């Protein structure tokens, strides 16, 4: 079993494994104007570390909004789990963060593929919220016995981390038997249209920042260098 979802949204669980509140959709206006407030004129410097297009919907600014409003969930939370991490946790009881989905948060260091601890410290949220990062292909755990019995499956079913951001899995699934992916661009269309290329390393230049490109994590440690374009959201 594997799970992928949209990016940036998350849930918080406490030390007993309880979900502290329903996740809030990234379309919520609570983050409006927060990127400018948080970074001021330092966007280019931040981009040189995170490599992610600065957008108010990103996890960074959702957490900043919670911090500013004094949301008590942050005081009792033990782990932050992005949506596919959260669903996998419900199935296995194992809490970790998959790399591709974590990269959408704007809280990773694009070069090291690890949490940006100085940024997390500046944000003012507990560092322990951010758990181990696992790569696609990692077995997260076994399906819980009670769930397996309920649906008639053996309890030896693996729950596996895929490219848990749906675009990461879509790009990885591009047929490549006859094609050199390094010479191809991709266009993945849904709520958003994502136009880009797959690279071995991020592009963290000022030009890339000002042009609105983002460096999201891909399967196999790749980088999806792309632009977010309006997709089917209006129709949806």
Where are these regions (language model features)?
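Gly/Ser/Thr-rich active-site cleft segment
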Residues: 46-167
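Glycine-rich beta-strand-to-loop/alpha-helix junction loops that act as flexible
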Residues: 1-6, 136-137, 189-192
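Generic N-terminal helix/loop capping motif
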Residues: 38-41, 136, 150, 174
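Glycine-rich phosphate-binding loop of actin/hexokinase-like ATP-binding domains
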Residues: 10-36, 77, 81-116, 157-236
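Active-site phosphate-binding/coordination module
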Residues: 2-60
């Amino acid at each position: 079993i594997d799970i992928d979802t949209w990016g940036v949204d998350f849930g918080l669980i406490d030390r007993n494994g309880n979900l502290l509140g329903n996740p809030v959709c990234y379309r919520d206006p609570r983050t409006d104007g927060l990127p400018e407030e948080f970074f001021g004129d330092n966007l280019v410097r931040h981009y040189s570390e995170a490599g992610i297009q600065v957008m108010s919907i990103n996890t960074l600014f959702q957490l900043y909004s919670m911090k500013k409003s004094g949301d008590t969930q942050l005081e009792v939370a033990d782990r932050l789990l992005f949506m596919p991490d959260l669903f996998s946790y419900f199935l296995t009881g194992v809490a970790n963060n998959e790399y591709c989905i974590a990269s959408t948060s704007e809280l990773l260091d694009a070069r090291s593929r690890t949490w940006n601890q100085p940024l997390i410290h500046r944000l003012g949220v507990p560092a322990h919220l951010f758990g181990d990062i696992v790569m696609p292909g990692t077995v997260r755990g076994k399906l819980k016995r009670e769930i397996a019995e309920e649906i008639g499956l053996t309890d030896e079913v693996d729950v596996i981390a895929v490219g848990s951001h749906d675009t990461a899995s879509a790009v990885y699934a591009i047929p490549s038997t006859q094609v050199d992916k390094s010479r191809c661009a991709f266009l993945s269309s849904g709520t958003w249209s994502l136009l880009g290329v797959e690279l071995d390393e991020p592009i963290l230049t000022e030009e890339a920042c000002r042009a609105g490109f983002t460096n999201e994590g891909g399967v196999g440690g790749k980088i999806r260098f792309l632009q977010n374009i309006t997709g089917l959201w209006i129709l949806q």
